Amino acid sequence: EKVGENNVNIKTDSSEFQIVGQSGENFPVMNIVEENANKLSIEKEILKNMIRRTNFSASIDESKGVLVGELIEINQNDIRMISVDGFRISVYKEDMKNENLNDIIIHAKTLSEVLKLLSESDIDEDVELIIGSKEALILLDKTKVSIRLMEGEFIKYKDILPKDCNTRMKVDRKFLMQSIERASLMAKEGKNNLIKCTIDGNLLTINSRSDEGSVKEELIVKKEGDNIEIGFNSKYILDVLKVLDDEEISIEFKNSLAPC
């Protein structure tokens, strides 16, 4: 029940709410994307996977500029979504035919909200992405989401991706995740949740230690190349393992000091 210009009363058999509102004229108007904006259709499940598998490694530090966003590259034969937080890089590539479009950067928090929208929708149809010079629109069924694009130059991520490896390990994803979760119980937060991984032959040993005690986990793996001993922040590894669906995953190492 509307009361006066901007107030509303909501009544039930046993409750009554009085809500003070504001004039609808104060609500921000949705920005209009140019008529000549580029358009792209993408399967809903593909877009969900792209966001889910990259969103976790975008920076949450607003002082890092565009690193709080995710880069979307739309190439002739594929589309890629990239996030970087200064410690991790996530790149998701999906093969699909497109027109070559300009790269765009969208805030990771915005993409997280888009992921919620896609996950809650039971509409099984493609998502339309309309890209303007400063704004983008995401259209799904009767829902329209207006997004302000971020300005700035994204980090040249290809220059810092490992280009070769001396050790390759294949391992059951769930077993590895469970072992790291147990090892991380003793990983010291002040030491960046450090765990030590040693690959010797086809045996992976995971160790962690703190003032409260120590943990040792062993897993059988398939190894190619050199033996290696390397330390990791357990949280960073778990973040990756939790968004993957594969039963078996491959991890490549260059040496004990280089990223994997």
Across the structure, where does each feature detected by a protein language model lie?
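Structural preference for solvent-exposed beta-strand-turn elements
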Residues: 1-260
